[in-house]
């Protein structure tokens, strides 16, 4: 199993505790995970090792805030 597949497997396991509603999307769930995991891994490996942790943490913060805002918008509907 390559690193992208390992990332996808772990992410899919994490999703099982907080499932995403894929019903209204026209992309296969596993394909979406593979696409994004490959992109994230490419970005990670293309970053200087001494900068990786800070960039990774900043990215997690940005995505968490984005998810928070999207969830608030959905709850207002």
Regions inferred by a protein language model and the residue ranges of each:
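Residue-level detector of solvent-exposed, low-hydrophobicity positions
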Residues: 10, 17, 29, 40, ...
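Short intrinsically disordered terminal tails
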Residues: 1-5, 74-77
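Acidic, low-complexity, intrinsically disordered interaction modules
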Residues: 24-59
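Extended, non-membrane alpha-helical segments enriched in charged/polar residues
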Residues: 16, 38, 42, 62-70
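Residue-level signal for secondary-structure boundary elements
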Residues: 15, 19-22, 48, 68, ...
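N-terminal acidic leader/helix
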Residues: 2-35
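Long, hydrophobic or amphipathic alpha-helical segments
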Residues: 50-56, 60-63, 67-70, 74-77
């Amino acid at each position: 199993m390559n690193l992208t597949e390992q990332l996808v497997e772990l992410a899919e396991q994490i999703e099982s505790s907080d499932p995403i509603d894929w019903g209204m999307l026209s992309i296969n769930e596993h394909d979406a995970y593979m696409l994004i995991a490959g992109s994230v891994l490419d970005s990670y490996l293309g970053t200087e090792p001494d900068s990786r942790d800070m960039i990774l943490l900043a990215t997690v913060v940005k995505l968490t805030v984005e998810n928070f805002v999207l969830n608030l918008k959905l709850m207002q509907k």
